[in-house]
A protein has these predicted regions:
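Alpha/beta enzyme core
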Residues: 1-183
């Protein structure tokens, strides 16, 4: 239960801010729970179906607060779901930018990933999911679990690290200072 007498300190792992169009929404300890709805394009043939989902979500009386675009197919920016959410809905737009990278031999290009993130942030995405904690130690510990990896994006980061034989940092840690400077 939330205690009103507890002092909440922003940016100390209690509260963070999400961009919602031209306003900032505070989320975290002591704030209302936000509801996230997932959409995404895995096949180009599903584009119209996913657009209909957004239209149906817009008609809901008690809709979500956030719409996350989990697309794995990169399309023209103006047609992308995250862009439509930013420009045509009242919802916070969220993405998983690593899904849109074109890996070569399962290696992720940090410049391409950063370019995707910057483009999305510059055009109004309020929340991006990153996987900076994946490392060799976590990989070894996860191998003992029945389901070692439960995150598609985390799995992509891990695969990149394995191919690089854990030499160097996780792809997100390499570009984290730039991500923070744009955020």
């Amino acid at each position: 239960m939330f205690d009103e007498n507890i002092k909440i300190v922003e940016n100390k792992n209690y509260i963070t801010k999400l961009k919602k169009h031209n306003e900032i929404i505070k989320v975290g300890y002591g704030k209302n729970t936000l509801v996230n709805c997932l959409i995404g394009l895995n096949n180009l043939s599903d584009y119209k179906y996913e657009i209909k989902k957004i239209d149906k979500i817009m008609q809901m009386k008690e809709g979500p607060d956030i719409i996350s675009d989990l697309s794995t197919k990169r399309i023209k920016r103006d047609d992308s779901f995250w862009y439509k959410v930013v420009n045509e809905t009242p919802f916070i737009s969220s993405t998983l930018p690593i899904y849109l990278t074109k890996s070569k031999n399962d290696l992720i290009d940090s410049d391409e990933l950063l370019d995707i993130i910057i483009e999305q942030m510059e055009h109004g995405v309020g929340l991006i999911t990153i996987h900076p904690t994946v490392n060799e130690e976590i990989f070894k510990a996860s191998r003992k679990r029945m389901v070692p990896i439960t995150s598609r994006g985390g799995g992509m980061v891990l695969k990149d690290l394995i191919i690089r034989e854990f030499i160097g940092e996780n792809i997100y840690l390499k570009i984290l200072p730039q991500i923070i400077s744009y955020a």
